[in-house]
């Protein structure tokens, strides 16, 4: 194991030089164990941000975060998928990916959803799940059972990454994006081999998909809407980085490719968790709307990532059927009842 002092690491970032894989492993372990001072931690993560984190640095940091996490052991991972965003897009949309998980599970996928409370949005995935009546305070064993029995397991990030408490005050005080914003989506506690990930900057599409490749992902789709959305957008083209069969492809897709009309993000904007819940439930109750279209498109891509569907188009058709039949709404009700029983 190559040792590097925190001061040497900081000097590297100032000189815009890379911190190599083994060095980053050592440095990240110091941070995760709380062995660096808040000042040094802040300096290093800020330096990395200014320099721009490399694929190697991100991969090594994610490996350490996974190492320190409380894991969820899932037996059958064939169709296991996470649908997650880095957040920070500033769009304040309703919980598109959270709504999508019920559609995905109803259409034959299994979802290990990794999320937390709101940081930059009006409603984080954990806030949304609680508002819907889902108990998010489950043990790793209970989450694994929920995935097996219902097809959905929600993993509340603070319960799975206790070492992050060592950097939480630094992140809060800095108030800017750091490497930790892009590590969360790379550190699914159930090690989902398939993922649909939204990112907040176009440069991250190629970076994150290649980090996922190095971390052993099987089918990964990383997306960035050109209107700034960290989802597949209806308001603009969406940049895509796809890892499949060990090969990365980058391309662009548009709403009209899927027979959908372009709609600006204002159509999905909410001001509080109650509005987000109302829009989400409207979709699950089968209302025809732009909100339904963006959920079907993103759930369809996740079903393709999960190898349930043969393409995004096929996934979208399956998503529409799950909503029209009422199966997606039934899946929400099933999860609410199941998680209530587990802790009764």
Swiss-Prot record:
Reaction catalysed by this enzyme: N-(5-phospho-beta-D-ribosyl)anthranilate + diphosphate = 5-phospho-alpha-D-ribose 1-diphosphate + anthranilate
Gene Ontology molecular function terms on file: anthranilate phosphoribosyltransferase activity; magnesium ion binding
Keywords: Amino-acid biosynthesis, Aromatic amino acid biosynthesis, Glycosyltransferase, Magnesium, Metal-binding, Transferase, Tryptophan biosynthesis
Gene3D superfamilies: Nucleoside phosphorylase/phosphoribosyltransferase catalytic domain (3.40.1030.10), Transferase, Pyrimidine Nucleoside Phosphorylase, Chain C (1.20.970.10)
Pfam families cross-referenced by the UniProt entry: Glycos_trans_3N, Glycos_transf_3
Domain of life: Bacteria
Enzyme Commission code: 2.4.2.18
CC terms in the record's Gene Ontology section: cytosol
Positions contributing to 5-phospho-alpha-D-ribose 1-diphosphate binding: 85, 88-89, 93, 95-98, 113-121, 125
Cofactor list: Mg(2+)
Biological processes, Gene Ontology terms: L-tryptophan biosynthetic process
The keyword Repressor is annotated on this UniProt entry: no
Listed PANTHER family: ANTHRANILATE PHOSPHORIBOSYLTRANSFERASE
Function text: Catalyzes the transfer of the phosphoribosyl group of 5-phosphorylribose-1-pyrophosphate (PRPP) to anthranilate to yield N-(5'-phosphoribosyl)-anthranilate (PRA).
Record's subunit section: Homodimer.
Name of the featured protein: Anthranilate phosphoribosyltransferase
Organism from which the protein derives: Delftia acidovorans (strain DSM 14801 / SPH-1)
Organism placement in taxonomy: Bacteria, Pseudomonadati, Pseudomonadota, Betaproteobacteria, Burkholderiales
Gene: trpD
């Amino acid at each position: 194991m190559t040792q590097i002092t925190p001061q040497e690491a900081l000097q590297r970032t100032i000189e815009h030089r890379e911190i190599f894989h083994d060095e980053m492993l050592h440095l990240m372990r110091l941070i995760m164990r709380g062995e660096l001072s808040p000042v040094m931690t802040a300096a290093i993560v800020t330096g990395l941000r200014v320099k721009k984190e490399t694929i190697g640095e991100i991969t090594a940091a994610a490996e350490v975060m996974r190492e320190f996490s409380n894991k969820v052991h899932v037996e059958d991972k064939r169709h296991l998928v996470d649908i997650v965003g880095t957040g920070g897009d500033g769009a304040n949309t309703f919980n598109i990916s959270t709504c999508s998980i019920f559609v995905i599970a109803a259409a034959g996928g299994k979802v290990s959803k990794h999320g937390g409370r709101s940081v930059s949005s009006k409603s984080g995935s954990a806030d949304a799940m609680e508002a819907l009546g889902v108990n998010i305070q489950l043990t790793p064993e209970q989450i694994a059972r929920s995935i097996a029995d219902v097809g959905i397991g929600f993993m509340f990030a603070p319960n799975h990454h206790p070492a992050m408490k060592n950097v939480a005050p630094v992140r809060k005080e800095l108030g800017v994006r750091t490497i930790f914003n892009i590590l969360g989506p790379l550190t699914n506690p159930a090690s989902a081999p398939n993922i649909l990930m939204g990112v907040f900057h176009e440069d991250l599409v190629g970076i994150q998909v290649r980090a996922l490749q190095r971390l052993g992902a099987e089918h990964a789709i990383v997306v960035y809407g050109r209107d700034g959305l960290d989802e597949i957008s209806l308001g603009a083209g969406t940049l895509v980085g796809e890892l499949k069969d060990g090969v990365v492809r980058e391309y662009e897709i548009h709403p009209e490719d899927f027979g959908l009309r372009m709609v600006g993000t204002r159509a999905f904007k909410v001001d509080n968790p109650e509005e987000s819940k109302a829009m989400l439930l409207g979709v699950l109750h089968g209302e025809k709307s732009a909100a339904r279209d963006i959920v079907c498109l993103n759930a369809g891509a996740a079903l393709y990532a999960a190898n349930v569907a043969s393409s995004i188009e096929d996934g979208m058709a399956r998503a529409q059927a799950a909503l029209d039949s009422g199966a997606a709404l039934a899946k929400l009700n099933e999860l609410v009842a199941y998680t209530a029983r587990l802790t009764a």
